[in-house]
Amino acid sequence: KASKAYFLIAASTYYMQSHIVNGEIKIEYTDGQKEVLKLILPDNLIPLDQDIFVDGYAFNTKDPRPWRVRLKTGDVSKYHAGELGKTISNNPISIDGGMATMLDLPLNPVKELKSLSLETTANEVVIGLMGVTLVK
């Protein structure tokens, strides 16, 4: 049983996969019901090797920017290009050492957990689940 799950994920995805479900994390309870976290670029899924430029047009997000972990240093922040010492341009904002993304999913604390699965749903997308933390 848990009230919330936290996930550390790393993904390789591309701009052509923007605003569609790239993958799903599913948690199933013993009674058969499920909780689903849809992974959508750029709302909560950001490529491992890049940062995104949110300009309100091509890249507009519905959700607040997720927390990210710089894998080279272990620093945690809601990074943006300015913090990373990058300038905004039409070129990708590449990240030295890469960054993983932290996400959370509220759960029903009275139900017993049965399984967790990660499924990619878009072409040319790789998503890795690096860690899971359950909160009672």
Feature map (PLM): residue ranges:
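Beta-sandwich interaction modules
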Residues: 1-4, 11-16, 22-24, 38-135
